[in-house]
């Protein structure tokens, strides 16, 4: 009975999680076999993660395949090649299935012939943020690999958040709570977002003044995103 209760509890937890399957590179034999397995079995997962994407055509091909299979699977795309860096805007807009863009720091640093340090990859990260913002999708930073340097991870996470990233990957459970704290909207941010939303509803104009500061309508999308994130966190 105890095991049954425990299994039910775990089941409830997993119901609140999204299953994302990372495939091998789609330009390799193993990647094509992964895609074949999804197509032949009509595997229903929330999303598939695509590494080392280089061109929009790769995304279009996979989108068409999923459509032919009758699957509504989302796509998570990792930018970790120089070719992808130059094409990331077009890649981001190549499919409505794309809901998240990821930054692959190790491979990107190797391609750019630089050390994988934060200051060396600000430009590449910024290009990804701009592409993600133009599409209105999440932008997720590469995990911090030093498990003993929690302070370093905090600083890097805060930096990329300020840059425009909406999240950061993790490689160990002990990193998760810290990252959630950084990327989850604070009570103050939530309250401000609600005030801005309410003011625009009442004003029915393109701008409002809150606390003496002029706020224009384009800000609404970010306020909506913060409230959606906060609502999702509260339900988890």
Enumerate the language-model features and the residues they cover.
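Expand to "…catalyze enediolate/carbanion chemistry for C-C bond making/breaking, isomerization
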Residues: 2, 8, 12-236
């Amino acid at each position: 009975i105890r095991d049954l209760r425990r299994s039910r509890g775990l089941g409830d937890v997993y119901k609140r999680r999204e299953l994302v399957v990372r495939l091998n590179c789609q330009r390799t034999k193993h990647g094509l076999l992964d895609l074949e397995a999804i197509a032949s079995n009509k595997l229903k997962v929330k999303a598939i993660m695509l590494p080392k994407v280089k061109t929009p055509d790769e995304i279009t091909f996979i989108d068409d395949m999923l459509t032919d299979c009758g699957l509504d699977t989302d796509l998570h795309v990792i930018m970790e090649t120089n070719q992808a860096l130059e094409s990331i805007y077009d890649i981001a807009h190549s499919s409505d299935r794309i809901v998240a863009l990821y930054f692959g720091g190790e491979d990107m640093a190797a391609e750019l012939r630089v050390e994988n340090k934060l200051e060396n990859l600000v430009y590449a990260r910024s290009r990804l943020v701009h592409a993600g913002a133009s599409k209105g999708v999440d932008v997720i930073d590469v995990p911090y690999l030093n498990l003993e340097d929690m302070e370093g991870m905090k600083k890097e996470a805060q930096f990329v958040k300020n840059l425009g990233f909406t999240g950061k990957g993790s490689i160990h459970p002990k990193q998760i709570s810290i990252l959630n704290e950084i990327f989850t909207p604070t009570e103050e941010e939530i309250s401000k977002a609600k005030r801005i939303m309410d003011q625009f509803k009442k004003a029915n104009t393109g701008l409002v003044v809150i606390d003496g500061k002029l706020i224009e309508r384009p800000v609404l999308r970010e306020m909506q995103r913060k409230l959606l994130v906060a609502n999702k966190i509260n339900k988890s």
